[in-house]
Amino acid sequence: MARLIWVRTLAASFVLACTALSAYAEYPDRPLKIIVAWPPGGVVDTTARIIGEQLAIQFGQPVVVENRVGANGNIGTTAAARASADGYTLQAVTAETHAINPHLYKALTYNVARDFEPVALLARSNFVLAAKASLPVNNVRELVELAKASPGKLSVASYGIGSTSHVTLASFEDVTKTSFLHVPYRGVSPAVNALLTGEVDAAFVTPHIVIGLQKSGNVKILGAASLERMALVPDVPTFTEQGVKGFVGGNWYGVVTPRGIPGDVKARLADQMAKIAASPPFLAHAKSLGVDADYRDAAGFAEFLAKENERWGALISARNIEIP
């Protein structure tokens, strides 16, 4: 009798294992979709397209990038949260969508912990602090001195209230005990244009946006908000080198799915993301934007997300930054 039970148990286990392997082998059997909550042409969008191209090659299925823009990333993120948890809908996510907005909005239509499954962190980018050409400073230290001499008068553009450029400015003010006039714009292009025309004094931006403007003499790059000097602007000293110890600011780029996808499907996605993060096309794309490849698996990304939420949640609460 005991032998019969053992045989039946073994047979049942074998069937389950074969079923799981079959599901793993069959996925994907139709096109996949990557939701991007930002407009076409930006860092998130172009990064998602590189990921999509590589996934399509590896999976042998088309991968469509769908831009669902609006509400500082909330529209696209809500759409991703409500998608079927079958592994066919992914979202390319950033600090705004998954670490800032949850603390910024009183009424948010998604919950990061409840609605999403981290798959992988792929890359991180850091800001440089750029200033208009006519501003009488040449480095971060001189900017801090000028700001302390005239509290609240020097203007700094951001991509919008609660954007990574905004919270980086707020963090910079806290660390340096300074006060600037924050001028939020509706996106990257208007903020950079305001800097270029002299409408604002400075802005935290990604280096690839302003490196050409620096070379033409239209802006100055005062410092790199990174732990080490950036490859795109190797002559620009870090904030740490200029006395603002350990200061970093920027964004990051990862991939999530709706929570509840089958474990074998998640495992296959995670495996492919690890390969993409090390692929020449992805690394070349990252290098061209001054973005650092920083792969972390699902567990590592989940831990990173928790720390990012703690960091930005505390700052947003202390500063009373909110959007109704």
Predicted regions and their residues:
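Hinge/capping helix and adjacent helix->loop/strand transition within the periplasmic-binding protein
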Residues: 82-88, 103-190, 239, 252-285
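Bacterial N-terminal signal peptides that target proteins for export
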Residues: 1-11
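N-terminal signal peptide c-region/cleavage motif recognized by signal peptidases
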Residues: 18-22
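N-terminal (or domain-start) structured segment
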Residues: 24-114, 153, 161, 177-204, ...
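C-terminal lobe and pocket-closing loops
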Residues: 210-280, 307-310
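An extracytoplasmic/periplasmic, membrane-proximal ligand-sensing/linker region
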Residues: 29-31, 178, 215, 241, ...
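Beta->alpha turn/N-cap motifs
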Residues: 92-97, 158, 187-188, 205-210, ...
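A ligand-binding cleft/hinge motif common to bilobed small-molecule-binding domains
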Residues: 97-107, 171-175, 202-236
